[in-house]
Amino acid sequence: MKVRLHYKKSRFFLSWQSTFVLLGTILLAAVAAFGADSATVIFSLDFPNSDPEHYSISVQSDGHAKYESSGKVSKDSEDDESYQSEFTLSNATRARIFDLASQSHYFSGKVDSGNKKLAFTGAKKLVYKDGQHDTSAEYNYSSQPTVQQLTALFQSMAGTLEFGRRLTYYHRYQKLGLADELKRMESEARAGELAELQSVKTILQQIYDDQSVMKVVRAHAKMIMDMGDSGSH
């Protein structure tokens, strides 16, 4: 009986040991698969003496995005200030970005037009990273339609996020500046010049909920929020 009991315990131990090994193998395989499927597209622009002078947008294949910029937040600012914001892209925009990156051969070839006669519109850079690629391209202007579309999309997103940056500043330090800023934002949104309005919903909601802000200003904030929720921009 003692021998049998010992044998059963050993077999039980080995069974659990095998289970842990199997689970570990499955977990490692899942992590490897996630790494293989995970991809990132980054767009950055550096344009001295503009506002902002620098910004970058990093987009992951799961839709998570991060925006960083530096520049003067208002005309009264003496020094450049850095700004960061994290948000989730709409499924449509996320899919479009990675589709355009694929059509652009993940920026592995020549992207810049090479035309030195064109005006300088900022040093732009596109980066693509996944399990099989780590490629990038720098350009002032590209004649490739897919790169042009990506550039326009990222610039429209940056326009929205810079409105968010300024609205955050005005709401905290200069509420009288909110009216003109929101009017301009609504006008540009209706003209199709802004993208991913939901990325700045937090500050718009804060303005709308602030009873110390004029009703007409809060109404503009609500209007822009509704436009973002409807996915019209």
Predicted regions and their residues:
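Bacterial N-terminal signal peptides
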Residues: 18-30
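A short, surface-exposed interaction/processing loop segment used at functional sites
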Residues: 65-79, 156-166
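N-terminal secretory signal peptides that target proteins for export/translocation
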Residues: 1-16
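Short, well-ordered, aromatic-rich surface patches in folded extracellular/luminal domains
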Residues: 34-49, 110-233
